[in-house]
Amino acid sequence: MRLKPSKMRNPTDCPQRHVLKGIKMSKTIRLTAAQALVRYLGAQMNEGGEPFIAGVWAIFGHGNVAGLGEALHGVRDSLPTYRGHNEQTMAHAAIAYSKQMRRTRAMAVTSSIGPGATNMVTAAALAHVNRLPVLLLPGDVFATRGPDPVLQQIEDFGDGTVSANDCFKPVSRYFDRISRPEHLLTALPRAFRTMTDPADCGPVTLAFCQDVQAEAYDYPESFFEPRVWYQRRIRPDEGELARAVAAIRAAKRPVIVAGGGVHYSGATDALQSFVETHNIPIAETQAGKSALAWDHPLNLGPIGVTGGQPANDICAEADLVLGIGTRLQDFTTGSWGLFSNPEREMVCLNTAAYDAEKHGAMPLQSDARVGLEELGVALQGYRADPVADTLKVEWFGKVDKLTDAPGDGNALPTDMQVVGAVQRAAHDDTVVMCAAGTMPGELHKLWKAPRPGAYHMEYGFSCMGYEIAGAMGIKMAQPDRDVICFTGDGTYMMANSEMATAAMMGVSFTVVITDNRGFGCINRLQMGTGGAEFNNLLDHAVHENPSAIDFAAHAAAMGATSVKVSSIAELEDALAKRGEVTGPYVVVIDTDPYPSTEYGGTWWEVAVPEVSIRPEVNEKRAAYEVAIKERNTK
């Protein structure tokens, strides 16, 4: 491309002298870099014909208000901008949106430089661990360096190229710094390639220098032509498929570990067909839960540390484990002590080679749906030995008693009884969600998900503070669903400000706050490793005055409809009224911090101190060493 002579400087200095391959350069349009970015976002479609970027969350500051703020205002009718109260939780809402949409759509989040940007680092890590797409657009310092150091700029004495946004590098799947307007011509396609590639999916960070946002450039018009990003469905390698088929055919007691990739691939129907044809039972991870309905005969339920006895018993005896779309984190594998059959083989079907080859597994790199279909064809005639029908009957005979409504009495309700009350109030369109604290374990064990997409758990990063913002994101993704968020008082105190955002926007969902007056889950873990109760429950923290937080009043002050209940019966009555409420509906109930579901579960490696003056710790250390030895000799 050539510039008009009247506008051209010394040709060797022309920033547009480089012609990019694959981009038609005949016609151009002059835009600021920020305008070019938002125009490009609006032209990127998914294979269903919807804009891949559904909207932009924004908190403006000096690092993005003049450039991106002006550009977003210009497209506000086609690319909506949403205002939140905290950069981290805005990003949580965006990530939850994408997770509930099974990665077919995503959102962007923009902040100013400095603290606004670093607030999003936790959310980037959450998306990175969970393999979820989000486009992060933190403002950055001046590319010209003329006004250095600008307000909120980090100065590295030994590296002049560093800014606060370098914090995003280890928690981004793709990171770029836009310090020239033309950088967008390569950075944006790379960003969308990352967000739409099942094997490489995750957060993208484009650190956008604030002066460059406002700088104009003659962009090729062809750059803004609509583009459809198709979901790549990797087919299995013939050799890997043959080896996996041979291993499965040799197995008599195989089990499938269904992970989140089953949902993201849209493979739930393929999974059901596969297990029914070959009589292979499944165990569900937190991300994979609801891949099959809870009452399907071959769904053994939750696996691992927060798992149930049916799945864990079968996994311990299995002679082959077929992981499908799972990261095999320690809560799933019992710190690799669960799959204890010494003759056990492992096959991992995953789009990412990194996950497919973990712990010496036999890799089957493939899209989950396609991989299951091709495995099914190759396994014609194969059926595994039957699994005892009594396993699930016995399990639910135990745990259903824990979720029953209590009789009359003054005892505080348990978290299990709260789960039971919500279960009785739920229906087929209900989505329950959570992330951290006590409830992820109880929900994994106890919740009966009736169909795919009815269970939304962020348990990769297990980030306290995801819940309220995440519930809002889920409801924005699927407005017709009945969204119920479980959160403890500890998580609520960490991040609750998007309650006001939801109230302002009229986004309706239900929040059940179980108030056990502290970090009850970690208090139990502390006791379980021999530690004294210390600094977890509020009564065990340094204080002069007892804590007495009125969560219902606090939620109401942010615009929510709220109620405090004192019993399971009152909780059920309150939940029955949730359909009458517009905006967030908060129900608070006090619970006992000590009980949890003792049935099921498996060993989890939490290092216990080798030296302690407490006999309780020494006793737990001895048990820990025995467990380590058993795990390492299996």
What kind of region is each of these model predictions?
Residues 179-182, 220, 343, 347-436, ...:
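Phosphate/pyrophosphate-binding active-site segments
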Residues 207-212, 437-440, 592:
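A glycine-rich phosphate-binding loop feature that marks nucleotide/adenosyl-phosphate handling sites
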Residues 26-383, 425-428, 508-511, 531, ...:
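N-terminal alpha/beta PP-like core and its mobile active-site loop of ThDP/TPP-dependent enzymes
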Residues 56-68, 72, 395-469, 474:
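Active-site diphosphate/adenylate-binding microenvironment
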Residues 145-158, 356-357, 365, 372-373, ...:
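Thiamine diphosphate
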